[in-house]
Amino acid sequence: MTQALQALIDQAWEDRTSLSPKSAPNDIREAVANVIGQLDAGTLRVAEKQGKDWIVNQWVKKAVLLSFRLEDNAPMSAGGFAQFYDKVPTKFANWSGDDFAKAGFRVVPPAVARRGSFIAKNAVLMPSYVNIGAYVDEGTMVDTWATVGSCAQIGKNVHLSGGVGIGGVLEPLQANPVIIEDNCFIGARSEVVEGVIVEENSVISMGVYLGQSTKIYDRETGEIHYGRVPAGSVVVAGNLPSKDGKYSLYCAVIVKKVDAQTRAKTSLNDLLRGD
């Protein structure tokens, strides 16, 4: 089933310039709708960890992009207090109280999640935004005005602080999604974009910006990482001097490994999660 679905999506991707809401064949529509439905239910993911490596299902990302070719914009109501005009419906548009109870997470108004995103049990969405294809795992808090970009993968027991930006893959087009692994803390107003991976148990301080070209300097070893924060790192904003010493450029600095003191400052509050 999955192989046939993948083959259909891959072929549709090759023919994408000829697709439109009026011309798309039914089998393509059904295939894309199938993928979006599975993403919404959490039974399919854009990226999955196999062993120590993350494997990106590029065909799933293609299906997300194709969905924008297959739908016209349409008016959408948000509880009668706001109107939107978009191609992608909101995740909770037709949910009942029973649906929310079964899903087991909290949504604080006016948080928005698009259909095709997945939110796991005991997660908390403060007034925030979760885009299509994103996966937010158990016990994670998406704090006020944080954004989880398209196809981003957020692990278990993660805290995305106020105003955090997690980049997406749709525009500008990125090869791989941003991945925040389990038990990470991302400080207020930090940005993680361009497919950067923050490995498990790491703490990113307030106001740190991470992209593929950002130097991530380990002050203990002198090593410089790109596109990956090693597991258990505590990272702050900093700068490194140029070779000629005339100027310095922004970087992120690994100042230490997570210890008990760090954990005490960034621990999650169980009172905010669960039933």
Curated annotation (Swiss-Prot):
InterPro entries xrefs: DapD_Trfase_Hexpep_rpt_fam, Hexapep, Hexapep_transf_CS, THP_succinylTrfase_dom1, THP_succinylTrfase_N_sf, Trimer_LpxA-like_sf
Reactions catalysed according to its record: (S)-2,3,4,5-tetrahydrodipicolinate + succinyl-CoA + H2O = (S)-2-succinylamino-6-oxoheptanedioate + CoA
SUPFAM superfamilies: Trimeric LpxA-like enzymes (SSF51161)
Enzyme class: transferase
Signal peptide residue numbers: none
PANTHER family documented for this protein: 2,3,4,5-TETRAHYDROPYRIDINE-2,6-DICARBOXYLATE N-SUCCINYLTRANSFERASE, MOLYBDENUM COFACTOR GUANYLYLTRANSFERASE
Family stated for the protein in its record: Belongs to the transferase hexapeptide repeat family.
Protein name: 2,3,4,5-tetrahydropyridine-2,6-dicarboxylate N-succinyltransferase
